[in-house]
Each structure stands twice: as structure tokens, then as C-alpha cells.
Amino acid sequence: MMTAILDYDPSAAETLRSALGADTVVLPTLDALRRHLDTHLGEDAGVVGASVDLESALDLASAMRLTRPSMGVVLVRRRVDTSVLADALRAGVREVVEERDLPGINA
């Protein structure tokens, strides 16, 4: 089982990869992530980095909740507030983590 990471910022993606360990794959675009998930059914988590806009991240989480309910989506944000948490909860996001709290990621 692996974790798929989506972050448009290569440096941030590498930081996420380091925090999560060896069983990760970094994908540079939302389309690349979707293609990867279509062919890798064993992925158990997707981490969406802070450089991905919130609407796209929540759309992905909503789609995964319906099509792959066993896969958790972890949302990384530069700042987390009640609005982000409420939107993430409605979309089916498993965890919301502030970028500065990367040890809090339990993907």
C-alpha cells in the first residue's frame, strides 16, 4: 500500500514525501493523480498539499468518498480555520493538517 501525494510545489512535495516515508509517490498534477489512482487500486491514502487550491482538493475528496471510500484524503493547508475544517468534513476529508505541523500527518 502506498500514499499518493499531490502538490504543485516540488519543494513542498519533497517535504511531504520525507515526512511520510518511503511508500509514497509524488504526482505533479490533479490529472496525473487521477490516472495514477485509476491504475493503482491499492493506494490507501492521498495527501493533497497546500499549493493545490481548496476547491480542487475538496472536489477530489468528494469523488474519492464516493468511488473509493476506503481511501482517505489528507488535506494540508498553510492555515486551518473553522471554515476549512467544515468544508473538509463535508467533502469527506480524513484529516486536515497545517503545513507547519507535518508530523501530524498520519496517512
Regions found by a protein language model. Name each.
Residues 1-17, 25-26, 46-47:
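Conserved acidic segment of CheY-like receiver
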Residues 33, 42-64:
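Conserved phosphotransfer microenvironments
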Residues 100-106:
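C-terminal output helix
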Residues 65, 86-90:
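Alpha4-beta5-alpha5 "output face"
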Residues 22-32:
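Short hydrophobic/Thr-rich beta-strand motif most characteristic of the beta2 strand and flanking loop
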Residues 80-86:
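Short, glycine/polar-rich helix-capping loops at beta-to-alpha or helix-loop-helix junctions
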Residues 70-80:
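A short, hydrophobic beta-strand element within the central beta-sheet of small alpha/beta folds
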